[in-house]
Amino acid sequence: MLADHQIPEQSMDEEERTSSRGWMREFKYPSNLRDITEEARISLSSVAHCGGVDELLHESSELAWRTNMSPPHRALFTFSKKTDISYVMLFLDYSRDESYCPQEVRIDLGDGTNDWWLKMYRRVDQPKGWVKIPIHDAFGNPLRVMSLQMTIMKNHEKGRDCVVRHFRVLGPFRSRYDSMNRMILGPSAVLEARPGTEPIKDAIMNHYQSMR
């Protein structure tokens, strides 16, 4: 449950950029994506006072996940079915959090907590804002998983606890595995995963609808 917090006033532009919806500004075609974070069951390896799942998912970056143990720190996202994932988005702020700010992150992907089949590593130096981590195969398609785990391996300045201000999981707006997509588009169903191809796909869909 969220405690009472005094959230500083910000300009509307800055408030939007730093909000949980601010990830949209990192993409040319944000309408191709959707936020699927809250479709998952989320568990955190440790939580400091007033810094748990509710704070991690809060709209404001003034609230955050705050850990309460030595690293590594883990956030586990478990989906109820196989789910297409396109990006993991982190909002980190070294200027505010300093030694609490993550520097080395690992993303594990799999079909369960005992079946991790891909590990991805990312290092960020003194980030201030959104960090984009693509979750794609060699052809640029989203990866289909049931579980995703972020492990914070190391903080800046060898800090112990960490602060993560936003964590969002993004999937494609339309899955290439949708039965309607496969029936109408055939091989073109993969277009939804490619940046800038939404107009092509819409044209195909509109043609189909006009012929029914």
Curated annotation (Swiss-Prot):
Xref: CDD domains: APC10
UniProt record, GO biological process: anaphase-promoting complex-dependent catabolic process; cell division; meiotic cell cycle; protein K11-linked ubiquitination; regulation of meiotic cell cycle; regulation of mitotic cell cycle
Record Pfam families: ANAPC10
GO cellular component: anaphase-promoting complex
Highest rank taxon of the organism: Eukaryota
Metal-binding among keywords: no
The keyword Transmembrane belongs to this UniProt entry's keyword annotation: no
InterPro entries: APC10/Doc1, APC_su10/DOC_dom, Galactose-bd-like_sf
Pathway(s) it belongs to: Protein modification; protein ubiquitination
Keyword annotations: Cell cycle, Cell division, Developmental protein, Meiosis, Mitosis, Ubl conjugation pathway
Domain DOC, residue spans: 12-196
Function as written in the Swiss-Prot or TrEMBL entry: Probable component of the anaphase promoting complex/cyclosome (APC/C), a cell cycle-regulated E3 ubiquitin ligase that controls progression through mitosis and the G1 phase of the cell cycle. The APC/C complex acts by mediating ubiquitination and subsequent degradation of target proteins.
Family: Belongs to the APC10 family.
Oligomeric form and interacting partners: The APC/C complex is probably composed of at least 12 subunits: apc-2, apc-10, apc-11, cdc-26, emb-1, emb-27, emb-30, mat-1, mat-2, mat-3, such-1 and gfi-3.
Entry protein name: Anaphase-promoting complex subunit 10
Originating species: Caenorhabditis elegans
Phylogenetic lineage: Eukaryota, Metazoa, Ecdysozoa, Nematoda, Chromadorea
Gene name for this UniProt entry: apc-10
